Amino acid sequence: MAPLRLFWIWLLVVGTRGVKDGDMRLADGGSANQGRVEIYYNGQWGTVCENMWDLTDASVVCRALGFQNATEALGGAAFGPGYGPIMLDEVRCTGTEPSLANCSSLGWMRSNCRHDKDASVICTNETRGVYTLDLSGELPAALEQIFESQKGCDLFITVKVREEDEIAMCAHKLILSTNPEAHGLWKEPGSRVTMEVDAECVPVVKDFIRYLYSRRIDVSLSSVKCLHKLASAYQAKQLQSYCGHLFAILIPQDPSFWTPLELYAYALATRDPVLEEICVQFLAWNFGALTQAEAWPSVPPALLQGLLSRTELVVPSELVLLLAVDKWSQERRTSHKEVEALVGQVRFPMMPPQDLFSLQFNLSLYWSHEALFQKKILQALEFHTVPFELLAQYWGLNLTEGTYQPRLYTSPTWSQSVMSSSYNPSRSFQTPQHPSFLFHDSSVSWSFVYLPTLQSCWNYGFSCSSDDPPLLALSKSSYSKSNPTIGYENRALLHCEGSFVVDVIDFKGWKALVPSALATNSSRSTSLFPCPSGVFSRFQVVIRPFYLTNSTDMD
């Protein structure tokens, strides 16, 4: 009967309910049913902007505070301006939400309002007649205490580690039986369970069992892989899904690149294509930084082969890429066949003639693979000196192949950046018209600007809709000489603090809409790898010219 007695003790545990994200209050109204709307988020209170504020939104606030409805939705800081951040802007509720945090909006702290536009409400004096005392917030801690006590158990767990001592702990069947997440651990009738665990995951086993009691767990960069592995092994589907979601959030937190490489190996071992693609995408977008990291020589040949096959590979230049492959092969002592496969993925036509000439002096691989390099250099020099119409006509070259397409080159030749916090987030710059040496005397002038608000669109002379900002604008100077055989597929790189690239976006015409840096209730998409700060630190445009092979000039 001891487990049953402990279970009833757990049900009787009480405590105080703390403030949590999304909680609301009314301030400076003089009475309980009116005031300036304030909402809690990330450890502080803030206000709500009046943009799109209406009676439906106000009623969500009133009902959450125990009143029947709202009678007025006020703007213009009707009860005085507030303090702190403007938490929400352009709130759009359906009326059934428990908090403004659950309504559509621009997202947390993504507003350009001032406090003279703080939203307020007046609620009906009548309350709903129902009052709730909610002490359930203390239940997880109470359940954890029962597990930590290791008393009154009726389920005995043995944790087996390969060729090492076993670890013993115990649990309570009654509590575990209430949680579907625990059913995979305790499948068969009986009082004993054996868990087989890798040595690296032993430190989180106790956390995993504790989670089956409390249904809450802290997941970090160091624990996410093992918790995902345990959740997968014991069918804790919700924890497994949660850890899978966290991979993209946690990977950018490791500047050493060991974590994405480790998770890539784990994805292959568990045949998880989603995790595999997340790791490969992060490494591709941060390839230049990867080549400078201590982990660079540890990149597996198959992974490097896959990375080099990608056009959306972020690197200063193709020469930098080839030199990095050269260094990688020296440190790994790669086989002749593996080197040739990797060199075959290098886009020699994207290197200018002077770089091609320097390879014989700066590349250790050159003389051990001389025939291959001479073939590739000749192919590149033909690209640089022969009009593409003749290449297509006489050699049958397909100039849409990856070999003839630029990657995401971040050197000043093809790229320019603006800081999101800059007072004047705009740049004017020039690039070559095309990578081919045939165009070395022709340049194109560009203007690149970050437009965080509708007002900034108007200030820079752009026509934006209200749904566009924040966005990036890229325009080509009308004075730049046009060539009907050349097109552009330009991209914008979104950098998080620490300069990791967390997303790459396309330009549709002159504009590229900037996604949210963090997941919000906004209808706007979120960057693939979120920024913990909630803002992108830098935007970098990359110019990518290519031949229009179906141009009428070919006829």
Curated annotation (Swiss-Prot):
Its main location: secreted. Glycans are attached at residues 69, 125, 362, 398, 550. The keyword Nucleus does not apply. It comes from the Eukaryota. Keywords: Cell adhesion, Disulfide bond, Extracellular matrix, Glycoprotein, Secreted, Signal. Residues 153-221 form the BTB domain. Disulfide bonds join 49-113, 62-123, 93-103. Pfam families: BACK, SRCR. It is found in: Secreted; Secreted, Extracellular space, Extracellular matrix. Residues 1-18 form the signal peptide. One of its GO terms (biological process) is cell adhesion. Residues 260-360 form the BACK domain. Homodimers and homomultimers. The multimers form ring-like structures with a diameter of 30-40 nm. Binds LGALS1 and LGALS3. Binds ITGB1, COL4A1, COL5A1, COL6A1, FN1 and NID. Interacts with the gamma-tubulin ring complex (gamma-TuRC), composed of gamma-tubulin, TUBGCP2, TUBGCP3, TUBGCP4, TUBGCP5 and TUBGCP6. The unglycosylated form interacts with PDE4DIP; this interaction, which is PDE4DIP isoform-specific, may connect a pericentrosomal complex, made of AKAP9, CDK5RAP2, EB1/MAPRE1 and PDE4DIP, to the gamma-tubulin ring complex (gamma-TuRC) to promote microtubule assembly and acetylation. This is Galectin-3-binding protein.
